[in-house]
Swiss-Prot record:
Gene: invA6
Entry-annotated residues carrying O-(pantetheine 4'-phosphoryl)serine: 631
Keywords: Phosphopantetheine, Phosphoprotein, Transferase
Protein's name in the database: Inactive atromentin synthetase invA6
UniProt cross-references to InterPro entries, sorted A to Z: AB_hydrolase_fold, ACP-like_sf, AMP-bd_C_sf, AMP-binding_CS, AMP-dep_synth/lig_dom, ANL_N_sf, ATP-dep_AMP-bd_enzyme, PKS_thioesterase
Record organism: Paxillus involutus (Naked brimcap)
Biological function: Inactive atromentin synthetase homolog. Does not accept 4-hydroxyphenylpyruvate (4-HPP) as substrate. Both the adenylation (A) and the thioesterase (TE) domain of the invA6 enzyme are inactive.
PROSITE patterns: AMP_BINDING, CARRIER
Region (Thiolation and peptide carrier (T) domain): 599-669
């Protein structure tokens, strides 16, 4: 088999590349990663590694020089040697922040160990435990280096040796000149990476010092890196693009680097532009789905057009999935709008690569505005120096395809991995003739340039992450209405679609001409969508019911995804799709109410935009949260509606109370006409009203608001109503003056909403104590309270309450206006000022973009501070007393104590106030994060299990 002769990729349309790159590569000849590290420190000690963390709402950048980072990593390595692990031991490195991951990897290498970078673990407990057990068995043992949050996620798996970075730091000392780092050989294992596990449990990709060096040399030459270059990365460090492509490759050439947690950019898209300007960034990386999202979000910041100096940026690499040409062009146009130089040009370089190829190995950098792309997706171009590619017949894996004809893409070169760890069978099957790596992708090479045309493997890529079709199908098969073993899911991408999706084919258990077919089909499709969203965060593009007698299986009894997709693309399933739409239309028609007033129609268009629906499909009876609305969407709806209706403010709580279009329209009309009287205070805020199981009432945390519960409430759709209890005072009402007054008001609100028990009530943090008091009052009225959930709060809280200054700073921290450390450092100096002066200082220090995002004015912020202060004052005089029938206590990692001390010395005291034995349940995350986006899916499962265990 003869590979296609391709010249290495070169950089087009900019002056970043110079002869200095090749001269530097020649001058420096490291043969291991530690050579790269020590050479960079020696030649460029003052060059920088900078970081923006997930908690840096204030845009602060933390920086270490190469020299400082070297000392830090060596100190960690010195402490690591005390573990007594044999040289070559595998250490699983598990962090979310770039700096932690980076320091851990270099410390492992310096100490003679092999780091294995672990991506974020699944929130599905069974899958997570299965994965961790698989990794442990693969390595024969498992040492995990992580933080307290990571340790909490894996604590239930037996046999793990869990080491904390905080403990390693505590033992680390300044290392003297006599410290001798490990001296590896070029072919030793360097870093291990996990595949996505898209076809089962993850495989472990072994990269040696030699493969990584070959890749980084070639990447640096392609990118035109020099010691004067400055790069920015916002891909996770556990991904080869984040660690090899955007850290080790620039380090090889001595380039300064900025690593930004993706949440920091998504929270404030303009930060991407500011960082490019402030740090004079020349090279950046962003996958296709982030390019698309960044474009959409930045387009809303038109007031910043022409405000940024973006002249430094020379190239933006993109990969992870096919890059839509229109997306790349829209992104480049958006950057041009923001640039001070109206003639600025931007090179977007789509790339192909896998974990097995050290990320990108084929590139096509072009100025997409100057050279319009020829195809729907950007071409992927030509391979890096040393890499070869070929297209072959996928049936035999050997016969070359002619130019312009699609087939299986294979690559070979020194940057290709050497093997899968402890998996010779998978290694052998991944190579042809021992050298050509089978990527599993279908591609076309035409006139020397490659472009992708599909995939052989059974995976779907959502936002750059691969998900296994087989595992998704396993869960979809459990849906009522699906005939067992007659369901298939297949990846699919419509023309112009920004990211890949999938289609579900299945045979229903009921006849499609039966009288109740519309209702049954609607319920089945809704359940299939719910499972899909919970499994892979994306609903299917199409669900196609096919009668059993028309769903053909192979001789081995399997459905052919390829055949089904081909039938779908060729229009052969159009009659089934039309029949399903007809039945679903009948089902929807039973409840569909066309928006009638202009306000309803405007809100209908807004709902359609937020949830990517056809305007004609939006009913006046549609509920914002049942459509999938989350806490971020609430803020978006609030902003857009205020703009469309030219209103100074629509209260967030009113959106929560009026999520149905017709109801919200009436409220908006009352604001527009200015004849709406202020509603009487009602603490009960309905977040979810579907189904008829016992409702859950959740009391607000210490800041008084209930937005923290919006994402949690979504998981109770079609199961039970979910009500939040919100404090008095946000609309100008008088504050509560005691815990008794507050609890009595909430108990009365719960009784108005649900006149009779049994009740289920819970509260997070401060709200847990209030929930306990509400439950006592309900029981004293003769009602049964079958569930009382207390989330991470002890019974005695008086000494935990903040004074006014600390309360104000704590609120600012929780709102993302400053870090916890900054809040603690600021407290002493603020206490010397009056309250008015303290607030003025705090307001000036708050990042404007975050204030805008929260739509906070000085008046609203000050009022919120007084509300939180009022709650704190109620807590200062509170002493628990009496008892309730049951208690379920949930606890996370505390800010200061160990989890064991937090449980045993504080939380277990709830036993003194319960007439039965309380249950104590561990939940993932820290106190401040246990209900955030990363943890809420895990928390809800534990919480719902507890409700069911109480017979609810």
């Amino acid at each position: 088999m003869a590979p296609v002769a391709i010249t290495p990729a070169t950089l087009v349309g900019h002056d970043l590349k110079s002869s200095r790159a090749s001269e530097r590569a020649t001058e420096l000849s490291p043969v291991t990663l530690l050579d790269i590290f020590s050479r960079a420190v020696s030649l460029y000690p003052k060059h920088e590694l900078s970081f923006v963390t997930s908690s840096a709402h204030d845009s602060s950048v933390q920086t270490r020089s190469f020299s400082e980072f070297d000392q830090y990593a060596r100190a960690l390595a010195w402490a690591m040697l005390a573990w007594g692990k044999p040289t070559g031991s595998v250490i699983v490195v598990y962090f979310t922040e770039h700096e932690d991951n980076m320091a851990a990897v270099w410390a492992c290498l310096l100490a003679g160990h092999v780091p294995c970078l672990q991506p974020a673990l699944s929130e599905q407990q069974a899958h997570k435990e299965g994965h961790v057990a698989h990794i442990k068995n693969l390595f024969s043992s498992a040492t995990w280096l992580t933080n307290e949050s990571g340790a909490e996620q894996v604590h239930s798996i037996t046999g793990l040796d869990i080491r904390l970075l905080s403990e390693l730091k505590a033992r680390a000392e300044t290392v003297g000149a006599d410290f001798h780092a490990h001296q590896p050989n070029p072919d030793d294992e360097a870093i291990l990476f996990l595949t996505s596990g898209s076809t089962g449990f993850s495989k472990v990709v072994v990269h040696t010092h030699r493969t990584i060096l070959a890749a980084c040399n070639a990447k640096g030459q392609s990118y035109g890196l020099t010691s004067e270059s400055k790069t920015m990365n916002w891909v996770g460090f556990d991904h080869v693009a984040g660690s090899l492509e955007m850290h080790i490759a620039p380090l090889l050439y001595g380039a300064s680097q900025l690593h930004v947690h993706v949440s920091a950019i998504l929270a404030d898209p303009s930060r991407f532009l500011r960082l490019i300007e402030e740090k004079s960034i020349q090279l950046a990386f962003a996958p296709n789905f982030l390019l698309a999202k960044l474009t959409r979000d930045l387009e809303k910041c038109s007031d910043l057009f022409g405000k940024f100096d973006l002249s430094s940026i020379k190239r933006i690499n993109s990969g992870g999935e096919a890059v839509v040409s229109s997306t790349a062009q829209a992104f480049a146009r958006t950057l041009k709008n923001f640039a001070k130089d109206g003639n600025a040009s931007f090179v977007i370089s789509a790339g192909f690569g896998t974990t097995e190829t050290c990320a990108g190995c084929i590139y096509d950098p072009i100025d997409v505005l100057f050279t319009p792309p020829s195809y729907e997706f950007l071409e992927l171009g030509t391979p890096l120096t040393g890499c070869e590619m070929c297209i072959v017949n996928p049936q035999d894996g050997v016969t070359p395809r002619p130019d312009g004809e699609s087939g299986e893409l294979q690559v070979r070169g020194p940057m290709v991995f050497v093997r899968y760890y402890n998996d010779p069978k998978a290694t052998t099957s991944s190579f042809i003739e021992g050298v050509w790596y089978r990527t599993g992708d279908v591609g076309i090479i035409e006139k020397g340039k490659m472009r992708l045309n599909g995939r052989i493997k059974d995976t779907v890529i959502v936002h750059g992450v691969s998900y296994g079709i087989a595992e998704l199908e396993t869960y979809l098969q459990t849906v009522e209405g699906v005939t067992h073993s007659f369901l298939a899911a297949a990846p699919h991408r419509d023309p112009g679609q920004e990211t890949e999706g999938f289609v579900i084919f299945y045979s229903p258990t009921f006849e499609l001409d039966s009288e109740d077919a519309p209702a049954k089909l609607y319920a089945t499709h809704r359940a299939l969508r719910d499972v899909s969203v919970k499994m892979i965060t994306l609903p299917p593009q199409q669900i196609i019911p096919i009668p059993l007698n028309q769903m053909e299986k192979t001789t081995l009894g399997k459905l052919s995804r390829v055949c089904l997709v081909n039938l779908f693309k060729q229009g052969e399933l159009a009659n089934h799709i039309a029949r399903a739409e007809e039945l679903l239309s009948i089902a929807r028609g039973a409840t569909f109410i066309a928006p009638s007033t202009e306000t309803e129609k405007t809100l209908g268009r807004l709902y359609a935009e937020i949830f990517n629906l056809r305007v004609s499909d939006v009913s006046a009876s549609d509920n914002f949260f049942e459509l999938g609305g989350n806490s971020i969407d609430v803020i978006k709806l609030k902003r857009e509606a205020e703009s469309l209706f030219e209103l100074p403010e629509i209260l967030t709580v009113q959106i929560l109370k009026h999520p149905v279009i017709s109801s919200l329209a009436k409220y908006v009309d009352s604001l527009v006409s200015k004849d709406g009287s202020q509603e009487e205070y009602d603490p009960v805020v309905p977040l979810q009203l579907t189904s008829n199981k016992t409702p859950i009432f959740m009391v607000h945390p210490g800041i008084g608001e209930v937005l923290a519960y919006v994402d949690l409430a979504k998981y109770f759709q079609n199961e039970r109503p979910f009500f939040a209890l919100r404090v008095r005072g946000f609309e100008g009402q008088p504050l509560f003056t005691s815990m008794d007054e507050m609890a009595s008001s909430y108990a009365a609100g719960a009784k108005r909403t649900q006149p009779h028990g049994p009740y289920a009530i819970a509260g997070y943090s401060y709200g847990g104590v209030v929930a306990f008091e509400v439950a006592k009052r309900l029981e004293s009225m003769g009602d049964e309270v079958k569930f009382i959930g207390l989330v991470d709060i002890p019974p005695h809280i008086a000494d935990r309450m903040h004074d006014w200054t600390s309360g104000m700073l704590n609120l600012s921290h929780l709102l993302g206006l400053m870090s916890k450390q900054d809040a603690d450092n600021l407290a002493p100096s603020l206490r010397t000022l009056t309250r008015k002066e303290q607030f003025e200082v705090l307001w000036k220090l708050s990042p404007p973009e975050r204030l805008t995002e929260l739509q906070l004015t000085p008046e609203k912020h000050e009022n919120w501070v007084y509300i939180a202060g009022g709650l704190s004052e109620c807590g200062m005089t509170y002493q628990p007393g009496g008892s309730v029938s049951v208690l379920d206590v949930f606890y996370a990692m505390p800010p200061h104590d160990t989890k064991e001390d937090w449980l045993n010395q504080h939380l277990r005291r709830w036993a003194d106030f319960c007439r039965s034995e309380p249950s104590f349940t561990n939940v993932p995350g820290h106190h401040d994060t246990l209900m955030d986006f990363d943890h809420v899916s895990g928390f809800q499962k534990i919480f719902r299990d507890a409700l069911e265990a109480r017979g609810l």
